[in-house]
Each structure stands twice: as C-alpha cells, then as structure tokens.
Amino acid sequence: MVNNGPALPPVAPGVLRIIPIGGCEEVGRNMTVFEYGEDIVILDMGVQFPEEDMPGIDYVIPNIKYLAGKERRIRGVIFSHGHLDHIGAAPILLEKLGNPPIIAMPLTLAMIKHRQEDYQKGSSKKLKIITVKSIDDTIALGQFTAKFFQVEHSIMDSMGTILETP
C-alpha cells in the first residue's frame, strides 16, 4: 500500500488551494486543480507518453485520488488547447469525475468529442459542453469567474485562463 502522507486539511475560508496533479517538471499529464470554498475548477486533463524504459505502457494519466469524494464540487473542466498532453485523459477521467461541464474553444471541443468517440462509441453524448465563442467570454463556475486570453501556440483555438475568486 502506498502512503501518500497526511490528508490535506479542508480549505480555509477565503483561501485558494492550487494542486498540480500533473505536468510539473515533466512533459505531459497536465492537470491542475483549483479549490476555493466548496468549488473546484480543473484546468486540463492530459496524458503523458511513456519513456523508453516503460515497455507495454501506452500512456500515463493523472492520479485523481485527491478528487475522490469531491466530484459534486467540480464546477467545470477548462481545456487550454487540443494537444493530447492537455486533453488526452479526458475520456477516462471525465466519467470518473461524474461528467462535469467542459469549457474550451470550438476546435478543442471538437477534438475532445472525437477522442471520446474513439474511446467509447456514443460517449460524447454525455459531455456537458460550454463553448468559449470569444476570448472576451466570462463564465461563472460557482465562486470562480473564468476569463480568457489569447495565446500563440502550434494549434488553433489555444487560450489562457484567468480564474477570479471573491
């Protein structure tokens, strides 16, 4: 049995907790949890491709153990762009997290839908989609307000996110 250390205390009132689930000091598996009060917003759900010394492994997904029992508090998952290191784990993790709303630009959403269908036929029908139609859109996610800004990247419809709290 793996000992992950002591459990984190509840988030104190007025405190923003940021938990990088993956993507820190590694390429891939990008996923960050933002927790404020009773609300959780997730940024990205990517896969990581295996190293040469990992035969038989197709990809590595983020460990979402921290979110167990908190599924009803997830107000949405924001996807920054459509590369697999940012959307690749969505077909596996979204269902495990109760299919929370997903937020992204149109191309990114189309890529997520396609990946869902590749994973399990008909599963894209379960997606609760919020389309960022303009970089000027503002979306309320519980106590969070999500705002967006344009970023240059090698794929269209990439966006940065600003999460505001009260």
Model-based region annotation:
Residues 24-29, 36-79, 91-100, 104-108, ...:
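Pre-active-site segment of Zn-dependent metallo-hydrolases
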Residues 33-38, 158-166:
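Metal-dependent phosphodiesterase/nuclease catalytic metal-binding core
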Residues 77-87, 150-155:
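Histidine-centered catalytic micro-motifs
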Residues 18, 34, 44, 81-82, ...:
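Divalent metal-coordination and catalytic microenvironments
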Residues 19, 41, 78, 103, ...:
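Hydrophobic/aromatic beta-strand patches that form the interior of the parallel beta-sheet core
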Residues 8-10, 15-24, 28:
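N-terminal amphipathic, basic-rich helices that act as targeting or association modules
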Residues 2-5, 10-12, 107-158, 164-165:
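Metallo-beta-lactamase
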Residues 5, 60-66, 88-90, 133, ...:
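A generic local structural motif
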